[in-house]
């Protein structure tokens, strides 16, 4: 399969730079997986699309202010993007500098360069950095870090992004990108869903900066997926199995929830799904056999990204590309702060030929 098969024309004007004033007021494009039929509406229509007893699975990761500015003690400017927090003192990070720092290099971080850190080791493209400070890594980031807005949101981060680029149910700090499908849920909508009898469960996948890395190969099968840490606890497993047993649907909110659930299913030895606490490199593209997820809430993704490949594997390649074409024609807002889709599973997707 060629990466270019997943390309589409997107006018720059359709990239959302700010969210809607009200989280749940965005538009919703519904795609019926089996038929490819499209329905246009608003996000709160989700209430009518879900049945009592259906299970919504959210990702409760919380975005950390992961972008730091500063300089090497030797002089050159640097930009640090945290990939993950290793412990209370150390991070693994991408570092942009005219010349990469060497192990032992001293870094002065923060807009006022008040935080002292040392680059201790290099692991491929990533740098291990240790803070020489009494405070925890999280406290330091909250104090001097900037929200790591995606590269296509072409503006500096603002104070408001600390809440706007965060789901209302976020709980566990560690992501450098928001699980954006969840941004559309506000408390009133969650309350109405609960009142209808829709069940809810929470996985954790700390989204890494790798989610924005372009696919740099021509053939999809050659792509090496970045690694992210995911947790699917026992209560989620129990909820999924109970939902399936009563004939209801498991609905993933966001591709990160999909990847968490399907990783746990892949690793399971004795049941459909078992608890999972590990790094995952799961790469979902057409031909993938979904085991757990029956429906998906997701935003509109970048051309040629691994995420549009995941959606194509779920809904079918042709149905997905047709939906994106319609979304562009109807001027839906794209990417992290944009509009959403509700997609039901297409069991025929696994047999579809792509790009022919």
Curated annotation (Swiss-Prot):
Belongs to the QueA family. Signal peptide: none annotated. GO terms for molecular function: S-adenosylmethionine:tRNA ribosyltransferase-isomerase activity. It catalyses: 7-aminomethyl-7-carbaguanosine(34) in tRNA + S-adenosyl-L-methionine = epoxyqueuosine(34) in tRNA + adenine + L-methionine + 2 H(+). HAMAP family: QueA (MF_00113). Monomer. InterPro entries: QueA (IPR003699), QueA_dom1 (IPR042118), QueA_dom2 (IPR042119), QueA_sf (IPR036100). Transfers and isomerizes the ribose moiety from AdoMet to the 7-aminomethyl group of 7-deazaguanine (preQ1-tRNA) to give epoxyqueuosine (oQ-tRNA). Keywords: Cytoplasm, Queuosine biosynthesis, S-adenosyl-L-methionine, Transferase. Its EC number is 2.4.99.17. GO terms for cellular component: cytoplasm. One of its GO terms (biological process) is queuosine biosynthetic process. This is S-adenosylmethionine:tRNA ribosyltransferase-isomerase. It is found in: Cytoplasm. Pathway: tRNA modification; tRNA-queuosine biosynthesis.
